[in-house]
Structure formats: C-alpha cells, structure tokens
Amino acid sequence: MATARPSSCGRDSVPATPRASIDVSLVVVVHGGGASNISPGRKELVSEGIAKAATEGYNILKAGGSAVDAVEGAVTMLENDPEFNAGYGSVLNADGDIEMDASIMDGKDLSAGAVSAVRCIANPVKLARLVMEKTPHCFLTGRGAEKFAADMGIPQTPAEKLITERTKKHLEKEKLEKGAQKADCPKNSGTVGAVALDCKGNLAYATSTGGIVNKMVGRVGDSPCIGAGGYADNNLGAVSTTGHGESILKVNLARLALFHVEQGKTVDEAATLALDYMKSKLKGLGGLILINKTGDWVAKWTSASMPWAAVKNGKLQAGIDLCETKTRNLPTC
C-alpha cells in the first residue's frame, strides 16, 4: 500500500484537541484517480495539472472562500484538464458516449448534491453544487439533471467537444481486448477529487468522474454516491475516494474511513484499515484522500499509482508513485 503524508515521520504532530483550542490551518488535498502506472510521457502533464488544482483550491481558501468553494474550484480545474477522467477528457462508454458523475458535500450541515449519467455538461461538479443549494434533493440523474442544468442557466456543451483523441483510442483498445474491468486491476479507473478545511473549521469534499471506459450505458459508479465516493462531516473529517467503483460502493469506502476516525484512529490508520478491508473482502483496489477536523491529512492508495497534491501552511506537496513526493513553497503574495 502506498501512502503520502505531510511529514517524513508519518503524520502531523497536531494533537486531537477540541476545535476551540486549536489554530485551524487552511488545507486542500486533491487526487487525480487511482489507476495503473501513468506513462512517462504523461507524468509531467499530470503532475502539473494536479499541482495547479491544489493551488487553486488553497488560493480560494486564502481569499476567504469556504471549504465548499475550494473543493469545487479544485475539481473544476481537473475537469477542464484533458489529462484527467472527468469533464473534458472523460472516458467513453460502450456506445462511444460520455456519461459523467459528480458529488459534493458540506461538512457543516451534511448538505450534499450529486448528479449522474450527465452528457453535455462541461463541469458536473458545478451542477452537483447547484443540486445541493437550489433543490430539496441530494441526487439528480440523466435527463432530469440536464433539464435542471438548463433551468439554472448552465450552457450545454456538445458531447463531441468533451471527447479527446486519447479517449477514443482508449475505447478502441478496450473493445479489442474485450476485457471487463476486474476489481484488482483498476486500469480504467479515473476519478478526480478534493477535500478541504477552511478558516472556520468547515470541511468539504467533491468528486467527479467519467466512469470506466467501455462501461455499459447507464452504469453509475461510486463517485456520485454520498458515503462511497466521498463524505464530509465537521466532527470527523472529509474524504474523496477513487478506484474500482463497484467495490467502493459495496464497502461504502469514504464513510468507512471516517468510521475509523470516529473510533479514534489517525488519518493514516483509518485510510489503511478502510482500503485493506476493501482489498481483503473484494480484491478491490483504489485510493483516498482524507483530512480530519484538526487538519491532519493523508493520501493513500493500493492501486499502482494515484496522482495527488496537498497544500497546507503555504507548502505544496505532490506526487504520483510511491516515494515520489516533491515539495515547494507557494508564493506569499
């Protein structure tokens, strides 16, 4: 199992004290999906994209934005980047179409919004937030979600403009190989996500995906499902997950990780226990990012790789593979 943590000693030394007695740090952690090894030709682009997304989220927090603002902003950046399987660059289903899923949650009051199987929306995470804030519901799907988007003034983006040459070739390759995705081989699992802690101690998560390549039409995975694709609760923490969607759904991975936090485990221990359970029970591989209410964070995965980046106290850390962490200070101005 691979782990990225905020210090060489394994975790921050912040004690688990009541929120009123601590100085809340601004924290943003993002991931670009747990999958097979990323080709050398793409690593630089992926690293650059994930670092930009984390920086965007952190800058939103620095400017006084909320945790919800930060995770939406970070995930929007990744949806707009063709190197990631969300928004522009989403993988294609068996019919060669895009069907995207996303969810978002505010840990302050457990407000949540999600959409699934949307086609002509460039930024599904923005639509998920509107579901959270402008409807009495938590989840809209397919045509209903797209009608709601039109009602909210979100412009339609022709599906063909969201499709890239890389995703076309990816689908062709999968059809030739005739391989259904196995739980222990998440080569087609791409998801993006973010978690954040703001200056008021509020937590949030957002997750967005194009799903798995060559999936059945109408297939919905874990990403839009609250508790599986992510969860946020100010009393516990915030999580965004990635990996084999069916396995993540079956174990409710995000809430499972926070259950272990609730039982007094560190973020590292909680992530390990949750991912190990999914692997031992279902052979499911994946990853997650997790922040607790005091600002401790971890990025952990059982898949071959997982692009991630985190910003805390003005310091950016990022990586893709095990033992590959780069650190730099962000500009102070």
Curated annotation (Swiss-Prot):
Catalytic site: 191
Keyword entries, A-Z: Autocatalytic cleavage, Cytoplasm, Hydrolase, Protease
Reactions performed catalytically: L-asparagine + H2O = L-aspartate + NH4(+); Cleavage of a beta-linked Asp residue from the N-terminus of a polypeptide
Record-stated family: Belongs to the Ntn-hydrolase family.
The protein's Enzyme Commission number: 3.4.19.5, 3.5.1.1
Primary role: Has both L-asparaginase and beta-aspartyl peptidase activity. Is highly active with L-Asp beta-methyl ester. Besides, has catalytic activity toward beta-aspartyl dipeptides and their methyl esters, including beta-L-Asp-L-Phe, beta-L-Asp-L-Phe methyl ester (aspartame), beta-L-Asp-L-Ala, beta-L-Asp-L-Leu and beta-L-Asp-L-Lys. Does not have aspartylglucosaminidase activity and is inactive toward GlcNAc-L-Asn. Likewise, has no activity toward glutamine. May be involved in the production of L-aspartate, which can act as an excitatory neurotransmitter in some brain regions.
Underlying gene: Asrgl1
Other noteworthy facts: In vasectomized rats, autoantibodies against Asrgl1 are present.
One GO process term, biological-process aspect: asparagine catabolic process via L-aspartate
Natural source organism: Rattus norvegicus (Rat)
Ranges annotated as spanning the membrane: none
Pfam families linked: Asparaginase_2
PTM remark: Cleaved into an alpha and beta chain by autocatalysis; this activates the enzyme. The N-terminal residue of the beta subunit is responsible for the nucleophile hydrolase activity.
Tissue: Present in testis, brain, liver, kidney, heart and skeletal muscle. In brain, specifically present in the astrocytic lineage. Present in sperm (at protein level).
Protein name, entry field: Isoaspartyl peptidase/L-asparaginase
Compartment annotation: Cytoplasm
Highest taxon listed in the record's lineage: Eukaryota
GO CC, alphabetical: cytoplasm; photoreceptor inner segment
Main location: cytoplasm
InterPro entries the record matches: ASRGL1_meta (IPR033844), Ntn_hydrolases_N (IPR029055), Peptidase_T2 (IPR000246)
SUPFAM superfamilies for this protein: N-terminal nucleophile aminohydrolases (Ntn hydrolases)
Subunit relationships: Heterodimer of an alpha and beta chain produced by autocleavage. This heterodimer may then dimerize in turn, giving rise to a heterotetramer.
Positions with a binding annotation for substrate: 219-222, 242-245
Entry's Gene Ontology molecular function annotations: asparaginase activity; beta-aspartyl-peptidase activity
